[in-house]
Amino acid sequence: MTTIRVKENEPFDVALRRFKRTIEKLGLLTELRAREFYEKPTAERKRKKAAAVKRHYKRVRSMQLPKKLY
């Protein structure tokens, strides 16, 4: 459970922003969304493999020299 201590005379907005930042750093929202519905192990493997292929092609594309535009 994530907790933050609200300092004296600290506005609510600032405390809420700090809380959201800590939640984002821990990755709790992404994990919560992933666990919201059951995903079959085969579907999970397929999704992760597709993401890895996409990352690979993105890395290859960024390493290539740009085409000449003349």
Swiss-Prot record:
Cysteines paired by S-S bonds: none
One GO BP annotation of this record: translation
UniProtKB keywords: Ribonucleoprotein, Ribosomal protein
Protein source organism: Leptothrix cholodnii (strain ATCC 51168 / LMG 8142 / SP-6)
Protein name as it appears in the record: Small ribosomal subunit protein bS21
Recorded family membership: Belongs to the bacterial ribosomal protein bS21 family.
GO MF term (any one): structural constituent of ribosome
Keyword ATP-binding attached: no
Source organism superkingdom: Bacteria
NCBIfam families, sorted: S21p
Gene Ontology CC annotations of this record: ribonucleoprotein complex; ribosome
PROSITE patterns: RIBOSOMAL_S21
Xref: InterPro entries: Ribosomal_bS21 (IPR001911), Ribosomal_bS21_CS (IPR018278), Ribosomal_bS21_sf (IPR038380)
The organism's taxonomic lineage, starting at the top: Bacteria, Pseudomonadati, Pseudomonadota, Betaproteobacteria, Burkholderiales
Pfam family, one: Ribosomal_S21
